[in-house]
Amino acid sequence: MRHKPTPPKGNKSLGNALASKKKVSKNQVVFFDYRDERKLKRFINDQGKIIPRRITGLSAKEQNLLTHSVKWARFLAVIPYVTDEYK
């Protein structure tokens, strides 16, 4: 007979975030274009920070591509560094 999985110890809110995370890519090629503002904003929180890999579900290579695309888009003023409410 199988037992119920126990929630992660420590931060309870983190356990909920990890349980509800979606894998963005599973055997798919993910391409992040620095000009695609809508796609990049999915991976940025309301403070303007890049969401970490453990929440987004991206692989290390994909997260690295995302980070470079977000930083390049910020540099070219495609997306803001921070939102207006945090200025």
From Swiss-Prot:
It comes from the Bacteria. Residues 1-21 are annotated as: Disordered. GO terms for molecular function: small ribosomal subunit rRNA binding; structural constituent of ribosome. It holds the Pfam family Ribosomal_S18. Keywords: Ribonucleoprotein, Ribosomal protein, RNA-binding, rRNA-binding. The keyword Ribonucleoprotein applies. GO terms for cellular component: cytosolic small ribosomal subunit. Transmembrane segments: none annotated. GO terms for biological process: translation. InterPro entries: Ribosomal_bS18, Ribosomal_bS18_sf. Part of the 30S ribosomal subunit. Forms a tight heterodimer with protein bS6. Belongs to the bacterial ribosomal protein bS18 family. Binds as a heterodimer with protein bS6 to the central domain of the 16S rRNA, where it helps stabilize the platform of the 30S subunit. This is Small ribosomal subunit protein bS18. It comes from Chlorobium phaeobacteroides (strain DSM 266 / SMG 266 / 2430).
